[in-house]
Amino acid sequence: MADAKVETHEFTAEISQLMSLIINTVYSNKEIFLRELISNASDALDKIRYQALSDPSQLESEPELFIRIIPQKDQKVLEIRDSGIGMTKADLVNNLGTIAKSGTKSFMEALSAGADVSMIGQFGVGFYSLFLVADHVQVISKHNDDEQYVWESNAGGKFTVTLDETNERLGRGTMLRLFLKEDQLEYLEEKRIKEVVKKHSEFVAYPIQLVVTKEVEKEVPETEEEDKAAEEDDKKPKLEEVKDEEDEKKEKKTKTVKEEVTETEELNKTKPLWTRNPSDITQDEYNAFYKSISNDWEDPLAVKHFSVEGQLEFRAILFVPKRAPFDAFESKKKKNNIKLYVRRVFITDDAEELIPEWLSFIKGVVDSEDLPLNLSREMLQQNKILKVIRKNIVKKMIETFNEISEDQEQFNQFYTAFSKNIKLGIHEDAQNRQSLAKLLRFYSTKSSEEMTSLSDYVTRMPEHQKNIYYITGESIKAVEKSPFLDALKAKNFEVLFMVDPIDEYAMTQLKEFEDKKLVDITKDFELEESDEEKAAREKEIKEYEPLTKALKDILGDQVEKVVVSYKLVDAPAAIRTGQFGWSANMERIMKAQALRDTTMSSYMSSKKTFEISPSSPIIKELKKKVETDGAEDKTVKDLTTLLFDTALLTSGFTLDEPSNFAHRINRLIALGLNIDDDSEETAVEPEATTTASTDEPAGESAMEEVD
């Protein structure tokens, strides 16, 4: 090369600064340099393949399309060669040094702002990532339209370009020779190279070959003289057919020696599964592929392999696991388990925009033909293509869930693991809300052994039933004895049991299903009734008006109103909330939130309605007591407060002052045991309460009224 003319050029200030920044970085994940260089090689191969479509002669200079990695341990040099389009002298000068790419400055600004070095590909300057591991580089390149040239730099302010008269003829393509830093020699090791290629470039469309040196055993003659004699003997014509057993015995003696041989090993032999026809792929192949990308030891529950063609092209294989991850809804958990490839080049497995959070349990691969390769391979920013891919993924996964639902056993397994995700989807995804609602399953008053779907519920509705009714609570045991169920059971209306905390969030968004309104029976609502029932109710309202007024006066601000209820049967009273506030169950959930906003709690905890049942003996007797003794009577007040606290508990609320409630119950217990001494009463509850005085035996009269 000494005789060839050496041209020296200066880097633009920005590129010089960029190389200096990269070469001195303390960034630990330096392996991404290999991903970037393989990606560039793949791009170059794409270009020559595209040219060859219209002009096949372009491939004559090097018919084989490949990427080859050659570790030269003795020289501490890593070579990466491709048979792509190559670069002319002008390309080498302009593209690698004198014309600043638009992304150069942007990348440096991003780095200064704390961005990850691995984002380098996003800015179109991935080539310079080689300076993460090397401080000197040669780029040998041959384009079909030019001679072979060498571009060389040590990351200073200058680079040279020389006509190459000494290196191996490439035919066509580019070879990078990276002179590795002393602390980066691991990238000459076969194991490390294979590890990085498997992680980042396993599904590149072109063969990635690694030149490896292996030690093999070989049989050789015992002496040199015998070796030469054997060679001479080989040149003589042989009549093997007349060779007898005696001749075989006279064969020369050999010995076994070890010697090093160089072989080329293909690292990405397994062609991308998603590029194959689904009908040609066995379930075992899908299972093996799933395990390789998910680290799961179980087979997947279901797989969806599809391609989208037209204005947008992409292929995907998506898997539904059998189990939910243990950290499914932790805030710091990775929100996406789908590997994104662009034309078989791995981009990222952390593109949160690729899939909604409620589908974060889905694992798989998406390979796009349309996304640009120079997007970040770690942090893809949102763009229109990604939105379309996301929309298609959601659609296909809902299809898959519906297919799973056709097998009851499979669906039970799926629903146990991922029902929360479906409900989160209903809460967040307005477009697919109704489709997801078809997947919901609940126990109910008519289906206590097996969960029922909303669709099946609708088919069982009596003709005069207009709404879908549900009750929320902490557990099945808690809700199935609720006083709110009585009136609906009497009308033969089915009520769904919703006992998962996320159910209520989902229902606030779902609102209706198949044109039927979803109604929480713990809140205020209109129950279907006949004309006769309406007339009877209006009569009862007038009859019990003095009692409702008296109870409201006693309870004060604890309730918004007291009403005569036609929705209670056996229970004497219940507490209902307004339509737009929190239910008792939601209030319980929100109180359990450690970081809750207390201002929101006071706003959303709607005023309570105290409902009384005119058919209850207790309410009938209380009405008489009020009419006889008036609302100011101590016994009336005491019984009203006890009745209210009991209704709070049976309606799913918690008591603000449980000690007061316990005091009243203890007084009734004492009375039942004929303990009516003042000193004993004081021992049970030493501190007087605002609603019960210790200087008169109110408990006795209270007990009489209860009886």
Curated annotation (Swiss-Prot):
Record motif TPR repeat-binding, residues: 703-707
The name this protein goes by in its record: Heat shock protein 90 homolog
Protein origin, superkingdom: Eukaryota
General function of this protein: Molecular chaperone that promotes the maturation, structural maintenance and proper regulation of specific target proteins involved for instance in cell cycle control and signal transduction. Undergoes a functional cycle that is linked to its ATPase activity. This cycle probably induces conformational changes in the client proteins, thereby causing their activation. Interacts dynamically with various co-chaperones that modulate its substrate recognition, ATPase cycle and chaperone function.
Biological classification of the source: Eukaryota, Fungi, Dikarya, Ascomycota, Saccharomycotina
Organism for this UniProt entry: Candida albicans (strain SC5314 / ATCC MYA-2876) (Yeast)
Comp. bias intervals (Acidic residues): 222-232
Family recorded in the similarity comment: Belongs to the heat shock protein 90 family.
SUPFAM superfamilies with a match to the protein in the record: ATPase domain of HSP90 chaperone/DNA topoisomerase II/histidine kinase, HSP90 C-terminal domain, Ribosomal protein S5 domain 2-like
Domain notes: The TPR repeat-binding motif mediates interaction with TPR repeat-containing proteins.
Record-linked HAMAP family: HSP90
Pfam families: HATPase_c_3, HSP90
Keyword Cytoplasm set for record: yes
Subunit structure: Homodimer.
Keywords: ATP-binding, Chaperone, Cytoplasm, Nucleotide-binding
GO cellular component, one term: cytoplasm
